[in-house]
Amino acid sequence: MYVLVTGGSGYIGSHTCVQLIEAGYKPVILDNLCNSKSSVLARIHSLTGYTPELYAGDIRDRTLLDSIFAAHPIHAVIHFAGLKAVGESVNRPLEYYNNNVFGTLVLLEAMRAAQVKNLIFSSSATVYGDQPQIPYVESFPTGSPSSPYGRSKLMVEQILQDVQLADPQWNMTILRYFNPVGAHPSGLMGEDPQGIPNNLMPFIAQVAVGRRESLAIFGNGYPTPDGTGVRDYIHVVDLADGHVAAMKTLHGKPGVHIFNLGAGVGHSVLQVVAAFSKACGKPLAYHFAPRREGDLPAYWADATKAAEQLGWRVSRSLDEMAADTWHWQSKNPQGYPD
């Protein structure tokens, strides 16, 4: 069964391709390689014996999308492609709305023309905004994200619900991620951000391997046990398995189904630093910096719905997330080859 994976050479997309292949699916990748490298395909082949076909292009290219649907019997689409840095989105809102919202519109139109009406969308816990209760449950109201990135994800969620309401033949699953970290346990695949990392774990990894001098921890006066921000960190392979679970339940379930994918427990920035220091066997340099606008003190997921309806649960601990990230970064100090 062929699955089109937009953004499939990126961090989460590539790990999901591995898990899809192991589950018997045949991913076809569309990626403009703006934050990834095509050399990941060789790593996917090393792990699975299968090399997905890569179309190096943009989801806003309707002609390219039509050619992909014409060339392959695509059964479903997993839609990862999009810009994803919260802070960057504040300074570049037009690019975020163009990529994330307009790009999804072009994809949906191409899917409709090809009569492919099975979609899994990569959303984010940022759609919840600041909630008065923790953990976050899917039934919580949305509508107050604090960044253009979060608003772009929420806009797409609303578009998907409108599309499905107009045409009930669509099967749509929205997966709201919390904080994906970690790497494939083989050390062959991991997160390789272009430029300065926007996320905590890859920045720590680059400090540990000597590419960065010190980690900036944004804020140490939050109302949390150690004063640093608390987040729900989920191992990327657990997250990838969540997509496979969603694929297995997608067909024949018309509607829009929303699931949190998180570990269901929060860890502070300093706890993550301690876990990584343990993994790499040395202390890591860090310093405190002012809070970033829009950052919340603490949140984590209630993933009960995914457990009950998808049969999915996380199985990897924070220590494993840190150890697997270090295994990847120490084997690949400069990331993937160009």
From Swiss-Prot:
Keywords for the protein's UniProt record, in alphabetical order: Carbohydrate metabolism, Galactose metabolism, Isomerase, NAD
UniProt catalytic activity: UDP-alpha-D-glucose = UDP-alpha-D-galactose
Binding, NAD(+): 11-12, 31-36, 58-59, 80-84, 99, 124, 149, 153, 178
Record-annotated membrane-spanning stretches: none
Cofactors named for this entry: NAD(+)
Entry keyword Amino-acid biosynthesis: no
Cellular compartments per GO CC: cytosol
Keyword Isomerase among UniProt keywords: yes
Entry-linked PANTHER family: UDP-GLUCOSE 4-EPIMERASE
Known partners and oligomeric status: Homodimer.
Protein's name according to its UniProt entry: UDP-glucose 4-epimerase
